[in-house]
Amino acid sequence: MDLGIAERVALVTGGSRGLGRGAVDALAAEGVKLVLAARAEGALAEAAAAVTAAGVEVATMVVDVTEPEAPQRLVDLAVERFGSLDIVVANAGGPPPGRALDLDDAAIMAALNANLLTSVRLVRSAVPVMAEHGWGRICCITSYSVVQPIPTLALSNTARVGLWAWAKTAANDLAADGTGITLNLACPGPHATERMRQLGNDSMAGSMGDPADFGKVVAFLCSDPARFVNGAALVVDGGATLAL
C-alpha cells in the first residue's frame, strides 16, 4: 500500500530506541523527512545515521521533551530545516511502577507532566503549522492501559487515560474546525523494548510484539489513506486486553 506520505515532514519524539525507533524506521521507509528528538545523544546519533544511510533527510535535537519549551523548539526546528511540519509522533517513556495508594503528589504530577502534558504541548505547537496547509497527522504513543488498567502501573494508567480523554476531545475540535488534521492514539501492549526489560518482563519475550511492526501501525495512522481515522485509540497488544 502506498501511504502517500513521501517527502512529508515528520517529528518523532523519543525516536532513538524502542517503539519510537520503530516508528522512525517505518516512516523513513516511506520516504518521510524526519526530525528526531531524544535525551540520549549517542542513541539519537545512531538512529539518525541509520536513516541517513537509507537516503532520508534528518534533523536532530538532544532535548528533554518534558521541559515546557521543548515542543515549540522542535516544531521551530522542523520549519527552519524543512519548511513545514506534516506529521507528529508524540512518544515519551513511561513512569516508574507503583501501587496507587503508595504514590505521593509529586510522583503523580511528574507522570502527568511526562505522559500527558508533554503530548498536549506538542499538539498545541504543531497544529498551527499543519493547519496552514490543511493537512496533518498526529499520533500519540500511549499504552493499552487506556482500555484496561495494568496492575502496579498506577502512574501510567492515570496519565495515559488523561491523555486519551484530552486527545479524543481535541480530535473532535480539529474535525469541527475543518483543519484536515487527524489526532489518534497508538496503544501498545507488551513489546520487546528496554522498557519491558526494566519492568522485569523478560520471561514474556516469546509473546511480545515487535517494535518494527508497531512502527508500521503508527505509519499507517500518519498516512494519507488514514484520513477518516480520527479520535481513535488503536490497541496493538496481540489480544492481551479483555476489554471490549
Q: Model regions: which residues?
A:
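Catalytic loop of short-chain dehydrogenase/reductase
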Residues: 137-162, 167-176, 190-191
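Short C-terminal tail/terminal secondary-structure segment
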Residues: 2, 148, 219, 230-244
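Conserved glycine-rich cofactor-binding loop
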Residues: 9, 16-18
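A conserved structural motif in NAD(P)-dependent oxidoreductases
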Residues: 203-214, 225
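Alpha-helical segment proximal to the catalytic Tyr-Lys
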Residues: 128, 172-176, 227
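Substrate-binding pocket helix/loop in short-chain dehydrogenase/reductase
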Residues: 99-100, 104-112, 138, 196
